[in-house]
Amino acid sequence: MTEQAEDALPIRFTDAAASKVKTLLEEEENDALKLRVYVTGGGCSGFQYGFTFDEKVNEGDFTVEKQGVQLVVDPMSLQYLVGGEVDYTSGLEGSRFFVKNPNATTTCGCGASFSV
């Protein structure tokens, strides 16, 4: 996919995140798994991000494929994530998937929750 085509997507999936998903799927030996990102109520800022592995793509789900792995977002969560990016980081504070969300007006210190 070209960079221009990626920019047109409602949510981006970085190379770092896709690479980590690929590694985890190889360890699980289950190519049917996809990384699902979702938004739920809660956290210190009102909404929080969640990540899970899921074998299913439900009707209406949005998917992005990169490096042979898929990111899946349900329609309700996608409305809060449009223009965002799912990334992965590893450092002194630990390793995690995270969302860069331009729609968030405030975020908590750890970046796991936000408000719009």
From Swiss-Prot:
What is its cofactor? iron-sulfur cluster
Q: Does the keyword Iron apply?
A: yes
Q: Which UniProt keywords apply?
A: Iron, Iron-sulfur, Metal-binding
- Superkingdom is Bacteria
Q: Does the keyword Metal-binding apply?
A: yes
**Cofactor: bound how, per the entry note?**
Binds 1 iron-sulfur cluster per subunit.
Q: Which Pfam families match?
A: Fe-S_biosyn
GO MF term set: 2 iron, 2 sulfur cluster binding; 4 iron, 4 sulfur cluster binding; iron ion binding
Which SUPFAM superfamilies does the record match to this protein?
A: HesB-like domain
Binding positions (iron-sulfur cluster): C44, C108, C110
Kindly state a single biological-process term from the GO annotations of this entry.
Answer: iron-sulfur cluster assembly
Alphabetized InterPro entries for the sequence: FeS_biogenesis, FeS_cluster_insertion, FeS_cluster_insertion_CS, FeS_cluster_insertion_RrpA, HesB-like_dom_sf
Which is a Gene Ontology cellular component entry for this protein?
cytosol
Concerning NCBIfam families, the annotation shows: iron-sulfur cluster assembly accessory protein, PRK13623.1
Q: How does it assemble?
A: Homodimer.
Q: Which family does it belong to?
A: Belongs to the HesB/IscA family.
Summarizing the function annotation, the protein's role is: Required for insertion of 4Fe-4S clusters for at least IspG.
PANTHER family membership: IRON-SULFUR CLUSTER ASSEMBLY 2 HOMOLOG, MITOCHONDRIAL
In its UniProt entry, what is this protein called? Iron-sulfur cluster insertion protein ErpA
